[in-house]
């Protein structure tokens, strides 16, 4: 988000991370059960960051690893990886995903620890201190952008929408259940713990996007930048992950369900009966 960067600002660039849509990126590479996670990172985003900032054999950490997207992409690229996941269900699935990647020929090694990333020194082995080349992670987004949706037809009525796979467990300690201020305070603690694990010159890469809550914009990228600064990190770059495909000089849109639904409704208002 260039607007939230201090002047003159770090390096800005655009990454083409949606040359394939998300389903194709995950098909076969990830276990079918992984689709149930409410907030999965796009594999190409993780792979691009890992390729950009690390070399084969180096160590990558994701302190909020979910189903292990960062870990899977890292070991496919010949890096080693460590992940921390708060919920046992997803930690087990991340470990299974690592085993699946190894069966597919991934050459790196990875390990998942189940625990609270706000307490990284208590969760991870001490020998990892100052060994991590890259931290890549993402804080929980608003519930409005979690999960998947399905259109449903009702007899004698217009179609409806059902949302599913959009919730974590009910454990109140999960940051996903906290308000924005509490979530960012917890995320700052996580970043502070990550800083102690970085090798000299190591990088922390955080993916974030804004969303709307009750009609108001929540500028998560700017809030994340502030959290990084509080954790003692120095902004180095801002990479925009393009969520559309590129074909020469043409852009291939990859709209969400709700974007398409909004377009359909707008067209009906302009041309009733179409």
Feature annotation, model-predicted:
Residues 1-274:
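Class I S-adenosyl-L-methionine-dependent methyltransferase catalytic core
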């Amino acid at each position: 988000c260039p607007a939230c960067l201090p002047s003159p600002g770090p390096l800005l660039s655009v990454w083409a991370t949606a040359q394939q849509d998300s389903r194709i990126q995950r098909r076969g590479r990830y276990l079918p059960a992984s689709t149930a996670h409410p907030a999965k990172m796009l594999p190409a985003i993780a792979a691009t960051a890992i390729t950009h900032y690390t070399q084969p054999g180096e160590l990558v950490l994701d302190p909020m690893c979910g189903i292990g997207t960062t870990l899977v992409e890292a070991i496919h690229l010949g890096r080693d990886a460590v992940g921390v996941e708060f919920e046992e269900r997803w930690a087990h699935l991340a470990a299974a995903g690592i085993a699946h990647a190894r069966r597919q020929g991934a050459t790196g090694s990875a390990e998942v620890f189940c625990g609270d990333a706000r307490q990284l020194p208590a969760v991870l082995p001490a020998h990892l201190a100052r060994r991590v080349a890259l931290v890549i992670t993402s804080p929980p987004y608003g519930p409005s952008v979690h999960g998947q949706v399905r259109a449903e037809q009702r007899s004698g009525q217009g179609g409806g929408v059902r949302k599913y796979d959009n919730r974590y467990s009910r454990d109140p300690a999960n940051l996903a259940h906290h308000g924005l201020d509490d979530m960012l305070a917890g995320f700052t603690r996580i970043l502070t713990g990550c800083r102690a694990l970085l090798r000299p010159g190591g990088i922390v890469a955080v993916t974030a996007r804004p969303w709307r809550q009750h009609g108001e914009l929540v500028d998560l990228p700017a809030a994340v930048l502030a959290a990084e600064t509080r954790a003692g990190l120095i902004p180095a770059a801002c990479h925009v992950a393009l969520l559309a495909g590129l074909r020469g000089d043409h852009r291939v849109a990859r709209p969400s369900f709700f974007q398409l639904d909004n377009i359909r409704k707008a067209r009906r208002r302009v041309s009733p009966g179409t």
